[in-house]
A protein has these predicted regions:
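Conserved anion-binding
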Residues: 41-129, 147
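Alpha-helix-loop-beta-strand connector modules within alpha/beta enzyme cores
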Residues: 14-35, 145, 150
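Glycine-rich, proline-tolerant flexible connector loops at the mouths of alpha/beta enzymes
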Residues: 2-15
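Hydrophobic faces of well-ordered beta-strands that scaffold small-molecule active sites
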Residues: 1-3, 33-35, 62-64, 84-88, ...
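C-terminal helical cap(s) of enzyme catalytic domains, especially alpha/beta-barrels
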Residues: 164-172, 176, 187-212
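A C-terminal functional module that forms or caps the active site or interfaces directly
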Residues: 132-180, 184
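Surface-exposed amphipathic alpha-helices with a cationic face
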Residues: 21-27, 77-78, 117-121, 141-145, ...
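A general structural detector for well-ordered alpha-helical segments in enzyme core domains, enriched
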Residues: 16-20, 49, 53, 112, ...
C-alpha cells in the first residue's frame, strides 16, 4: 500500500490518511505501508519527517530524495521502526535531466545505487526506486545492488512492460521487486470502480508472476 501524502495534505486530510494506515495495519498486517513522500532535508528536519512517517502514520518505509547527501537519509535508517526507499532512476519522462548526467565514467543514478548498497545499507534498511519505464537501467541497478529490494513504479498508465521488469529487475531468488501500479488501478472504470480496480490489480499481479 503506497499512499502519496500530497493528495491528503493538499486538502487537509492527514487524519484520514492516519485512519487508512491504521486500518491497513490492523486488518492486513502482512501488507507493507510505503509513505510516498519523497522527502529530502537535513538534520533535525529529516528526523521530524521520519517521525511523521513512522510514528504518526505507522508506515514501514518512506520514499526519500538523496540530492542533499547521505546525512539526509540516515535519520530514516536509524529510526527504530523505519526503512528508506531512495530515489535512484525514476519513471518520469524528465528524470534523465539529472539522473543520467555523467559523474566520471558513470551516470548519477549508478552512483546513487552504489552508495545505497555499499554505504547507506550499513546503517539500516534501504532500497531504491527504479522505474519500469527504463528496463535497461533497471538491469544495471540490479547488477550493482545485488538482492536489495527495488520499488518499481511505472507499470500501468506509464507503460512499463511487466515482462521486462521481471527479467531485468528480479534478484537471485526471482523476488526483490515491489511493483507499483497506481492510476491504472485507481481509475480502471468509473462506472464500477471497486470491481474494476480489483480486476486490474489481479491481472497485473498474475502477469508479473507469469514471468518469474
Amino acid at each position: 500500500f503506497k499512499p502519496q501524502i500530497a493528495y491528503f495534505a493538499a486538502i487537509g486530510a492527514e487524519k484520514q490518511l492516519e485512519n487508512i494506515c491504521a486500518h491497513i495495519r490492523s486488518n492486513y498486517p502482512t501488507i507493507p505501508i510505503i509513505l510516498d513522500a519523497k522527502r529530502g532535508d537535513i538534520g533535525d528536519t529529516a528526523k521530524m519527517y521520519a517521525q511523521e512517517a513512522f510514528d504518526r502514520y505507522g508506515a514501514h518505509a518512506v520514499t526519500v530524495n538523496p540530492y542533499m547527501g547521505g546525512d539526509t537519509i540516515e535519520p530514516y535508517l536509524v529510526h527504530k521502526n523505519g526503512a528508506a526507499i531512495v530515489l535512484c532512476r525514476t519513471s518520469n519522462a524528465g528524470s534523465g535531466e539529472f539522473q543520467s548526467q555523467m559523474i566520471g565514467d558513470e551516470p548519477l543514478y549508478k552512483h546513487v545505487a552504489r552508495r545505497a548498497a555499499h554505504e547507506w545499507a550499513k546503517h539500516g534498511d534501504v532500497s531504491l526506486v527504479v522505474g519500469a519505464t527504463y528496463p535497461e537501467e533497471l538491469a544495471e541497478v540490479r547488477a550493482i545492488v545485488g538482492d536489495m529490494p527495488l520499488l518499481v513504479p511505472g507499470v500501468g498508465a506509464q507503460g512499463g512492460d511487466p515482462e521486462a521488469v521481471v527479467k531485468n529487475g528480479a534478484n537471485s531468488q526471482r523476488t526483490g521487486l515491489i511493483v507499483n501500479s497506481s492510476r491504472a488501478i485507481l481509475y480502471a472504470d468509473t462506472s464500477d470502480p471497486m470491481s474494476a480496480a480489483v480486476a486490474v490489480a489481479r491481472k497485473t499481479r498474475d502477469t508479473l508472476n507469469l514471468y518469474r
